[in-house]
Every structure is written in structure tokens, then in C-alpha cells.
Curated annotation (Swiss-Prot):
Keywords: Hydrolase, Magnesium, Metal-binding, NAD, Thiamine pyrophosphate
EC category name: hydrolase
GO biological process: inositol catabolic process; isoleucine biosynthetic process; L-valine biosynthetic process
Protein family (similarity comment): Belongs to the TPP enzyme family.
Claim: Ribosomal protein is one of the keywords in the record: no
Coiled-coil ranges per UniProt: none
Chain's gene name: iolD
Name of the protein in question: 3D-(3,5/4)-trihydroxycyclohexane-1,2-dione hydrolase
Catalytic activity: 3D-3,5/4-trihydroxycyclohexane-1,2-dione + H2O = 5-deoxy-D-glucuronate + H(+)
Species name: Bacillus licheniformis (strain ATCC 14580 / DSM 13 / JCM 2505 / CCUG 7422 / NBRC 12200 / NCIMB 9375 / NCTC 10341 / NRRL NRS-1264 / Gibson 46)
Record bears the keyword Methyltransferase: no
Amino acid sequence: MGKKIRLTTAQALIKFLNQQYIHVDGEETPFVEGIFTIFGHGNVVGIGQALEQDAGHLKVFQGKNEQGMAHAAMAYSKQMLRRKIYAVSTSVGPGAANLVAAAGTALANNIPVLLIPADTFATRQPDPVLQQVEQEYSAAITTNDALKPVSRYWDRITRPEQLMSSLIRAFEVMTDPAKAGPATICISQDVEGEAYDFDESFFEKRVHYVDRKEPSERELKGAAELIKSSKKPLILVGGGAKYSGARDELIAMSEAYNIPLVETQAGKSTVEADFANNLGGMGITGTLAANKAARGADLIIGIGTRYTDFATSSKTAFDFDNAKFLNINVSRMQAYKLDAFQVVADAKVTLGKLHGLLEGYKSEFGSTIKELKDEWLAERDRLSKVTFKRENFTPEIKDHFSQDILNEYADVLQTELPQTTALLAINETVDPDSVVICSAGSLPGDLQRLWHSNVPNTYHLEYGYSCMGYEVSGTLGLKLAHPDREVYSLVGDGSFLMLHSELITAIQYNKKINVLLFDNSGFGCINNLQMDHGNGSYYCEFRTADNQILNVDYAKVAEGYGAKTYKANTIEELKAALEDAKKQDVSTLIEMKVLPKTMTDGYDSWWHVGVAEVSEQESVQKAYKAKEKMLESAKQY
């Protein structure tokens, strides 16, 4: 069967990756941009040898933590709208285990990444090898089995010829908009170096065509009838709308029929914040404008959204007794949610075709959209001017910390900077085409409510898995996607401590990133959650054994890595640092000490969490009763 070429399994892998292309809207580009790797005994003499011999066009980066470099790869793919990827190669055992959190993050967000962890010996001759786990009930179990639940596709290669069918399946999954997610191919470390006579045809240029799925006539007719029969429809813009590139169609439909837009975290910056009908974030971390509009809507048009609990306020955000749902999604599974009328098709194409079927229609929102937006902009302006006072200060998160405790934080951290004031000063100062990234803590809520992105695809939030540590690592991925733009990681001290290894990688390869570190000396978001539900402040503040607030010099840590660092505890210092950071060629870190409880609170929203049904604390008993009361009005499924 044709000409053969003798290669090791690892050499065949690298040769194949170099020949993968993607074709979207008439544009054909290489799909695999490069590979992140940390070499260990499981991959250094296999994949390492193959890369050293001939990496082709693949860019190779040495990561510092397997989870971190996989986050960077995911962020790159997400920012490139899933049209390019990086592969990730790790050694066996702990290196592979470190991929689990990153794989879960990519899976929850439907982002394609190729994970290539090494595996134990296929021959089992030297078993148990270094970093191999042993189970009494099966010799076939390895650490890599932990990646099965968090991979869209998973395979183990124990013979060289298995690689061919496995790679074809993996790339089919990664290039399918409906199924996109992490593909994991585990390669036994002895098999990496084993040679085989591969068919040369396997290494020919392979183009993966991503054609836009068209809606059927039935779907279009049903969707148009639903919209025309509604009085107050609302468009919920999800990540699928961004990946589809549906900005123009969303604006056209919203303007023509006076339909307000609200956004999920993944959908934010699909349409600019200053578009008149864009009411901002929806749900638990949403704006008052969006949540008010949602309560009055009689039709929710979900465009590429998964309807997470944060978007639906745990299924209390809408008038479920009367409102109907129209879901436009390439994923049939997602389209089925909330008893919706389903259009399983591409968002951009569907909206374009729907636009022509709604002639003469106008919603009854009238001037309400403008009124809601103006009301919210006034609140946003107020939050930009919050000033701390040492007496009678009421923070946004009320009734948690006394004035004495807030003053203690101000004294120890030597700051009076409120978080919302700092965030909005940053939004005002950075260049409009800069890209910001965040993932966990209180900052995603502040960002979804307050951040104005007026250039499309400049807001990058990982809020499907909300994985602490994604922020700094992901910023490296942003820089690889946008080498000529400033990229900013907005990160709390909790997430920074969890993982920031790829800051060193960014410095090492001269890929400038900017880390904006908000330090309130604790896990502030979860501290709010525990206290909101009747508990005390328990092990969420960063305090010493003798109850003293920790004051860590994060700027000195980053300086030791080689970053240009700044300390900014006033708005004047912050703006000056931001302007100076723009002039730098090296990665920067701006450390801001911010006061706890000065992040935004929720607006007309509710989050269902597991409150203790039995407690000696009256406050917890009260919180449980309140939760049960809210569930009476929540949709059950």
C-alpha cells in the first residue's frame, strides 16, 4: 500500500502535527502553532528527540508547570476563536497528573487543546517504573486514566501503528465546533521511541474544513414565529456567538427590532460595551440593567450559551412560568436546555437568515433599554469614585467586617484603595485594544459588571471551570495570540499564589505580559460567600497563627524573576505605573493592596449553594430557610 517511511512514533507524531490545516470561511491556516513541553524521563528521549531532530514549523516552548503551560495553550486557542492550537507534552506520572485541572478547564469551556502525556511501558518489562502507580486490581491503570473524565477524546498508544487512527479521531474532535475540547493521547514511553514503517500518505497535508451548519426551514420558521409572537425578547450572547463571529448579525438584529443584548462571561466583548442596546453581563455577576431586563422578558434567545448557574442565577433570573426559550447552538445537547425551541446551527448564519424573516416586527421595550443602561452607567460611575473612610465607612459588601477590622487591613497593608475604584481606573487607562484575562475570585464579578470592552474579543474570562491559576498562565497564551498588543492578567493574591509559573516562561522568551495583582490578603470572594450564608470569617483571611494579617511583598517576588515591578496603593500611583508599564519591553507586575469587602456585590440575583440544613448557629438556620424559599420560585431543571 504505497510508499513507506520509517519513523519512531514520536517522530511520526511531530511530522503529522506539521501537516494539519483548518479551513474556515475561505481561509486556510496551519492548525497547530506549536508545542509546550516539560521534559522528563517519559518524553525527553522520545518526543524530545523528535522535536530536536525536526520540529518543522512548530514553535517549541519550555513550560515551568504542566498545568500552567496547558492553561497557556488553552488561552491561546480560546483567544484565536478555536482556530489554532498548541500541543502540550509531559512526562509520565506527576507531570501527567498536573494536566487534570487544565484539561477540566478546557473541557468546561469547549476549547481544543492536544494533550500528550507520556505513559508507562507498553512491554511492562521494567515495571514498576519511576513515577508509576500500582493497583492490585489492574496493571493497566496508570495516572493518565485520571484524564478520561476531563477529555473530549482519550486514547492510549501501546503500538506505533495505533497513532494513525488515534490522531485522525483527535483532530476530528478538536475541529468540530459542536464537540471541541481537549484531546488526550497518552503514549507509552517505550513506544515513543519504537520505529514503524508508516504510510507516507498519512503525512500528506490534511485540511479540516469547518463549514457553518445551516438551520433548516423548520427551525427558521419556528424561531421567527417565536420572536414575532413575543413582546419583550432578550438576546443572551454566549461564547458560541463569539466563536461564530456573529457580532455584526447581533447588532443588526438588536437595532432593527429593538431587542436588548445581555452577555455571559464567555460572550462578553462579542459586541462592544458602548453599543446602545448592550446591557452588559447577565446573572449572578451581572449588571442591574441586564438582570432587570431578563425578569421582564417573555422570550430568551440564547445564542451559543450553556446556561450555567451564573448566567441563570441558579435558574431564578427569568420568568420561567411565562417566558419561552429559543436556543441557537451548534451543540444539540446545549440547544435542548430549558425546554427551548432548538435551532442546531451556526449562530452567524442563523441570525443572518432570521433577520430577513422578521420584517415589520418591533419589541415593546421602547425606551426601557436606554433607561436601564443609563441607570447602570450611573451606578458604575459611583463605583469608580468610592473612597475609604476610617469612620462610618460602608463597603459594597456590607455587615461582614467592622470598621475596626477594615482599619486594621488599611494599617497593615498600608492602603486605602477600594477594589472597584482601582479596576475602573485601569479600564480607563489601558489601551482600548488591550486584552484582559481573569478566571477566579471576586474579580470576574467586578469585570463582568464594570469592565467596558470597546474592541471586540478583548475580554477573556475563563468562567466555565473558574480555575485559580489560569490568569497568569493564560496571559502568556494571549501574548502568543497578540504579539503586538498589551495583555493584562487581572488576578487576586489567592489565584497568584495558586499558580503563576508561566510568568517566568514569559520572561524567559521575551513575551511581555502585564500582571495586575489585587492583594486583599485572603480568599475574599469565598469569605463573602461564607459570611453571606451565616458563617463567620473562617480560614479565608490570610492571617498568621497569632491572628496577624499577612502582608506579602509580591512585587519583590516578581522582581526576583526578572519582571519590572511597581507598587500602587493610590489611584495616582496606579495610573502612573500603568503608563510606565506600557513603555517596558519586559513583563511587568503591578502590586495593588486593596481593601477587603470593596468589590461589587450582586444585583438582583441569587446563587444556589449548599447551606447547612442543621446548625447551632441561628444565622445559618436563617440562611437555610432563605435558600429554601428561593428554591420555591426556581426552575427545577
